[in-house]
Amino acid sequence: AGIDDDSQVVFYSSGHMMWATRAWWMLYSCGHKQVAVLDGGLEKWKAENRDLSMDAGSYTAGQMRVNLDAERWVNKEQTAAAIEDGGICTINALAPGVYSGEADMHYGRRGHIENSKNLYYDTMMNEGCFKPAEDLRQNFEESGVWGTPRVIAYCGGGISATIDAMALTLIGHDNVAIYDGSMSEWVKDESLPLITGS
């Protein structure tokens, strides 16, 4: 069957888990809380010799009501306003070299949003799975993110940032948003600053 209000939904990816976490975030932000991600994705599932099907399946339409939680998404203006807001921590999920501006950035201008902290999405993972909760929490505590009331995560285009967002949600932070436009949008506006260095 399709997705109903009481359906348990599990997303998985045949590639990097960020594609599943992006789908998870979209449904989660639409008010559907019975949604999960298969840790390790299809690769781990296959490595464990679990059942697979080649059947495409046929499903009737579901009746899920969308109750969008607008607080789970922010735009360019809200992200810019957060730069000087001590109650909001902005985190960049890209690789350290991209964050600092030292590595090539195919989005355009190099650097990161002012006052944002670098929490590379890959540091949340271990062999394709999320790290244990205590390790995730340590990541966010050591970076100074954990005690902040609200967190905005961004990346290149709103995909890998959902790894950080899910990690925060898994350890109990309930006020996380994604800047959906991320660097793909930010770099195009020359009036918006970018900071280089770590």
PLM features: residue spans?
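Thiolate-centered catalytic microenvironments shared by cysteine-dependent enzyme domains
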Residues: A1-A82, E102, S160-A177, G181-S182
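C-terminal appended segment following the main domain
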Residues: Q138, E142-S198
